Amino acid sequence: MSKQKELFANEEIAEAEKTKLQPPPMYKVVLNNDDYTPMEFVVEVLQKFFGMDLDKATQVMLSVHYSGKGVCGTFTAEIAETKVVQVNTYARNNEHPLLCTMEKA
Protein backbone atom coordinates (compact mmCIF):
# COMPACT_ATOMS: atom_id res chain seq x y z
CA MET A 1 0.00 0.00 0.00
CA SER A 2 1.33 3.44 -0.82
CA LYS A 3 2.24 5.83 1.96
CA GLN A 4 -0.55 8.23 1.00
CA LYS A 5 -3.19 5.49 1.17
CA GLU A 6 -1.84 4.39 4.53
CA LEU A 7 -2.13 7.93 5.92
CA PHE A 8 -5.82 8.15 5.03
CA ALA A 9 -6.86 4.53 5.36
CA ASN A 10 -8.44 5.00 8.79
CA GLU A 11 -9.72 8.56 8.31
CA GLU A 12 -12.73 9.79 6.44
CA ILE A 13 -11.96 12.45 3.91
CA ALA A 14 -14.52 15.22 3.89
CA GLU A 15 -15.41 16.43 0.46
CA ALA A 16 -15.96 20.12 -0.01
CA GLU A 17 -19.65 20.77 -0.08
CA LYS A 18 -20.66 22.26 -3.38
CA THR A 19 -22.93 25.24 -3.03
CA LYS A 20 -25.55 25.75 -5.67
CA LEU A 21 -25.49 29.24 -7.08
CA GLN A 22 -28.87 30.88 -7.33
CA PRO A 23 -29.60 33.24 -10.20
CA PRO A 24 -29.91 36.86 -9.06
CA PRO A 25 -33.41 38.27 -8.56
CA MET A 26 -34.71 39.99 -11.66
CA TYR A 27 -36.65 43.23 -11.95
CA LYS A 28 -38.87 44.67 -14.67
CA VAL A 29 -38.20 48.26 -15.70
CA VAL A 30 -41.57 49.88 -16.36
CA LEU A 31 -42.63 53.14 -18.01
CA ASN A 32 -45.82 54.65 -16.59
CA ASN A 33 -48.27 56.65 -18.67
CA ASP A 34 -48.97 60.33 -18.11
CA ASP A 35 -51.03 62.89 -20.01
CA TYR A 36 -48.16 65.19 -20.96
CA THR A 37 -45.12 63.30 -22.29
CA PRO A 38 -45.18 63.14 -26.10
CA MET A 39 -45.25 59.68 -27.66
CA GLU A 40 -42.19 60.57 -29.73
CA PHE A 41 -40.20 61.24 -26.55
CA VAL A 42 -41.19 57.85 -25.11
CA VAL A 43 -40.00 56.15 -28.32
CA GLU A 44 -36.73 58.12 -28.11
CA VAL A 45 -36.19 56.96 -24.50
CA LEU A 46 -36.84 53.32 -25.41
CA GLN A 47 -34.34 53.49 -28.26
CA LYS A 48 -31.71 55.44 -26.33
CA PHE A 49 -31.73 53.54 -23.03
CA PHE A 50 -33.03 50.10 -23.97
CA GLY A 51 -31.57 49.65 -27.45
CA MET A 52 -34.93 49.02 -29.10
CA ASP A 53 -35.48 49.46 -32.81
CA LEU A 54 -38.24 51.80 -33.96
CA ASP A 55 -40.87 49.06 -34.32
CA LYS A 56 -40.28 47.56 -30.87
CA ALA A 57 -40.08 51.00 -29.22
CA THR A 58 -43.37 52.00 -30.87
CA GLN A 59 -45.01 48.78 -29.69
CA VAL A 60 -43.92 49.38 -26.07
CA MET A 61 -44.92 53.05 -26.27
CA LEU A 62 -48.42 52.04 -27.40
CA SER A 63 -48.61 49.60 -24.50
CA VAL A 64 -47.73 52.45 -22.13
CA HIS A 65 -50.31 54.69 -23.79
CA TYR A 66 -53.22 52.25 -23.85
CA SER A 67 -52.49 50.03 -20.82
CA GLY A 68 -51.07 52.64 -18.48
CA LYS A 69 -47.64 51.06 -18.33
CA GLY A 70 -45.19 49.12 -20.45
CA VAL A 71 -42.25 46.86 -19.66
CA CYS A 72 -38.96 48.07 -21.13
CA GLY A 73 -36.97 45.00 -20.10
CA THR A 74 -36.02 42.66 -17.27
CA PHE A 75 -32.67 43.11 -15.54
CA THR A 76 -30.74 42.41 -12.35
CA ALA A 77 -31.40 44.89 -9.54
CA GLU A 78 -28.34 47.06 -10.14
CA ILE A 79 -28.94 47.41 -13.87
CA ALA A 80 -32.66 48.06 -13.37
CA GLU A 81 -31.93 50.76 -10.77
CA THR A 82 -29.43 52.42 -13.10
CA LYS A 83 -31.86 52.45 -16.02
CA VAL A 84 -34.64 53.89 -13.84
CA VAL A 85 -32.37 56.73 -12.71
CA GLN A 86 -31.12 57.37 -16.26
CA VAL A 87 -34.62 57.54 -17.74
CA ASN A 88 -36.08 59.69 -14.95
CA THR A 89 -33.12 62.09 -15.08
CA TYR A 90 -33.32 62.34 -18.87
CA ALA A 91 -37.08 63.00 -18.71
CA ARG A 92 -36.68 65.74 -16.08
CA ASN A 93 -33.81 67.34 -17.99
CA ASN A 94 -36.14 67.49 -21.01
CA GLU A 95 -39.00 68.84 -18.86
CA HIS A 96 -41.23 65.77 -19.18
CA PRO A 97 -43.03 64.07 -16.27
CA LEU A 98 -42.41 60.56 -17.66
CA LEU A 99 -41.99 58.15 -14.74
CA CYS A 100 -39.87 55.02 -14.90
CA THR A 101 -40.08 52.47 -12.08
CA MET A 102 -38.94 48.94 -11.34
CA GLU A 103 -40.83 45.98 -9.93
CA LYS A 104 -39.90 42.42 -9.06
CA ALA A 105 -40.21 40.14 -12.08
Curated annotation (Swiss-Prot):
InterPro entries the UniProt entry points to: ClpS, ClpS_core, Ribosomal_bL12_C/ClpS-like
Choose any GO biological process term that the UniProt entry carries and state it: proteolysis
Alphabetized Pfam families for the sequence:
ClpS
Family membership noted in the UniProt record: Belongs to the ClpS family.
Protein's job: Involved in the modulation of the specificity of the ClpAP-mediated ATP-dependent protein degradation.
Q: Which PANTHER family match?
A: ATP-DEPENDENT CLP PROTEASE ADAPTER PROTEIN CLPS (PTHR33473:SF19), ATP-DEPENDENT CLP PROTEASE ADAPTER PROTEIN CLPS1, CHLOROPLASTIC (PTHR33473)
Q: What is this protein called?
A: ATP-dependent Clp protease adapter protein ClpS
* High-level lineage: Bacteria, Pseudomonadati, Pseudomonadota, Gammaproteobacteria, Aeromonadales
